[in-house]
């Protein structure tokens, strides 16, 4: 019997919470590594590079290599490269986004760029936003890394990409195309990167509106954990349901190969060459 399963998992609320590892996350990831299971950790955070996030996760007790981390910035760079192999963009964002675009072979410029790309930053500049508005009015296409309207900080809630995008839309009339969750484009690009198929992949998340929705729309089985922001009352608010609901990722550490208890990802050896 062969196990044919891959995983996409959200980061905040699933693996870590407020900078601390959620108990059992290390055991789950180690089970995947020990059994050569393909997986990718997803985050709508575009501030940090995968290498930065890998280092931060390590301080929380999770050893996840950069190539196993897929941010909304890397997904955005992947998408843009699929549209224009070597394009030009004016970027409002931090190193996670600029590094991803440079790596994809793009040129960052404010001189008649093809795209304006808006990402997360802790210090939105009025001057940069004004430049973005005028470039869009001049014909640049508008892309955003993710639709989140707020984000957490030590001092409280901060306006995030979605809020600033709304300001730019109000000034230009241009609606952005969002790449990050819940857009299934982010899931598809992550799947392609690890060579996985949606039919054999499980998405683990803590949010109905992003994680479960994007997994559902990408054709994945979904697991919602209660260790983040969602509870049973939150689940009932939506017209769709996850495949399975668990308390935390620790519940999957010992059943990673059969998360729903139905043997759906077990393939008889004689069939693995005929699919």
Swiss-Prot record:
Catalyzes dephosphorylation of dihydroxyacetone phosphate (DHAP) to produce 1,3-dihydroxyacetone (DHA). Is the main enzyme responsible for DHA production from catabolism of sugars (glucose, fructose, and sucrose) in C.glutamicum. Displays no activity toward nucleoside monophosphates (AMP, CMP, GMP, or UMP). The active site is at 10 (nucleophile), 12 (proton donor/acceptor). GO terms for molecular function: metal ion binding; phosphatase activity. Homohexamer. Keywords: Carbohydrate metabolism, Hydrolase, Magnesium, Metal-binding. Disruption phenotype: Inactivation of hdpA leads to a drastic decrease in DHA production from each of glucose, fructose, and sucrose. No dihydroxyacetone phosphatase activity is detected in the deletion mutant strain. It comes from Corynebacterium glutamicum (strain R). Coiled coil: none annotated. The lineage of its organism: Bacteria, Bacillati, Actinomycetota, Actinomycetes, Mycobacteriales. Its cofactor is Mg(2+). It comes from the Bacteria. PANTHER family: 4-NITROPHENYLPHOSPHATASE-RELATED (PTHR19288), HALOACID DEHALOGENASE-LIKE HYDROLASE DOMAIN-CONTAINING PROTEIN 2 (PTHR19288:SF46). This is Dihydroxyacetone phosphatase. The record marks 56 as: Orients Asp-12 for proton transfer during catalytic turnover. It holds the Pfam family Hydrolase_like. Its EC number is 3.1.3.-. It catalyses: dihydroxyacetone phosphate + H2O = dihydroxyacetone + phosphate.
